[in-house]
Amino acid sequence: MNALPKTLLLGLCIALAACQSTQPDTLAKSARLNISEPLLAGLEYAQLLNGDAPWAGADRVQVDDQGLLLLDAAGNSLARHAGRFEGLDHRVDDKGLLLATVERKRQQAMLIGLNAARAWSQPLYLPRTAFAIEGLCLYRDSARNDFLFLLGEEGVGEQWLVGSQGRLLGEARRVRGLSLPPQSAFCQTDDRAGQLYVNEENVGFWRYPADAEAPLQREPVDLRQPFGSLAHAAAGMTMVPGGLLALDSEASVLHLYRQNEAGWQADEVIALDGFDEPERISARRSAEGVELLLADERGLQSARLDWQPPALSQPEPIVSLPAAVETGPVPSLGDAADDPAIWVHPRDPAQSRVLGTDKKGGLVVYDLDGRQVQDLRVGRLNNVDVRNGFRLGSKRVDLAVASNRDHNSLHLFAIDRASGVLSDVGEVATPLSEIYGLCMFQDRQGTTYAIANDKDGTFLQYRLDGRSGQPRGELVRRFKLGSQPE
C-alpha cells in the first residue's frame, strides 16, 4: 500500500478537524439582511456597545478625524478624546468604558477609560512594538483582569496585561509573545469561554485559548475551500451569544456559525451585495435579531440581520483570586518554581514565611512581602509541606519536609519557632525510584507523618521521630494507585 504524501495527509487532517458539520454549498435565503441608509463615508473603525453602559442613549464607539467618539444612535457625540487613531476594541459595563486603539503619530497601542461621569482617564501607552500593529483586541478574564492582544502581519503577536478590576494599570505588563499565522490582522475574544479567534487571510479562522498560561494550541473554525466553506479571504469577525459572524472580504459574503457542544457549526452564508471588500464587522444581539456595523472600502454601513442563534448554557467560570504579593523569580532558570507552603509564626503572624521549591535546585524562603530571606541549595525538591510542634532532641521545632528527586528521599528542615530560620536536619531514604509528590499529616497524639509518592503510583507513609536529635523515618504504610499522582 502506497503512503499518502505528507502535504495531502496534513490537508486531510485539517479538513477533518474543521468539518464539524455540513458546510453550506449555496448562499442561504433564510436569514435576511436589511441595509440601513445612509453610508457613513470614509469611516473604518466603529463598534456597537455590548453591555450595560451607564449613559442613556449610548449606542456605539467610533474612530474618525475628530478622535475617539462615544455616540448615540443618531450619531450625536456624548464624549470625545481628540487625536488620530486606528484600530478599535472596547469593553463596557455599568461603571464605564475601556477603549483600545493605536495612536497613529506614536505608532503605539493606547488604552483609555471613560467613567460614568464622562471623564476620560489618563491614556496608558504600551511600549512601541518591534512590528507594525495590524490588529488588536481586548480580553477580560473571570478575575476581571484586562488583557490586550496585538497582531503583526508577519505572524508575530503579544499579550499584555493592561488593567484589573475596571482600572488601567500604571504600567502595562507584557505577558507573553505569540507565534501566530502570517497574514493575521483581525482578532476577537470570547471572555466567558476564554477563547481567542484570529484570521489567517489565505487559510481561514483559528481558535486559541486566551488565558495567558494556556498552551498556544489552535483549532480551525473554518478554512478555505476545499477544506472548508470559505471561498477567498478570511477577514474580520465578531461574536454574539451563540453565534460567530465572519467576513470573506474578497467574496463579499458574511459567514454565520452556530455554537454547539462540539464547537462551531457552519450555518449560513449571506451575500453582501453592493459592498466593496468588507473587512470589519461589529454585532449586537437584539430582540429582532442582530444589529450590525459593516466597514468596506467606501465606509461604514449599518444593517440588521434576521438571525437568532440559540445561546448555549455556559458553565460558571472558575473564580480567580488576584495575587496580593509576588516574589522574584527563583534562582534556577526556566520552569523551576513549583510548590509552596506557608509557615505561620506562632506569636507574630507578620513574621510568617512562604516556602517554595525550586525544583531544579532547592528550597527558597520568602517573607510576606515576597522578599527572599533564605536559599537552601540542597537538590531538586519537588513538593514541600509543613507541620508544627516536632520534637528534635531536647527542643521543639516546626518541621518542613520536601521530596528530594536527586536522592529519592524525604528532606527535612527544622524551623526555629522564634526567628523563622530554616536549617537542614537531614534526609530519610526511601526505596522509590522516582519520588514526586509529598504531603504531611499529624494525628491527635501529635505524631508527625510524611506521605510521598512515586511517578508509578506508589505511596509510602513514614512516621517521623526526632527525639534522638537525628530525625528518623519508619515506614508504616504502603499503597498504590493505577496512574501517576501529583
Regions found by a protein language model. Give the residues of each.
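Sequence/structural signature of beta-propeller domains
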Residues: 20-486
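Hydrophobic helical h-region of N-terminal Sec-dependent signal peptides
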Residues: 8-14
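C-terminal motif of bacterial Sec signal peptides marking the signal peptidase cleavage site
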Residues: 16-18
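Bacterial N-terminal signal peptides that target proteins for export
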Residues: 1-8
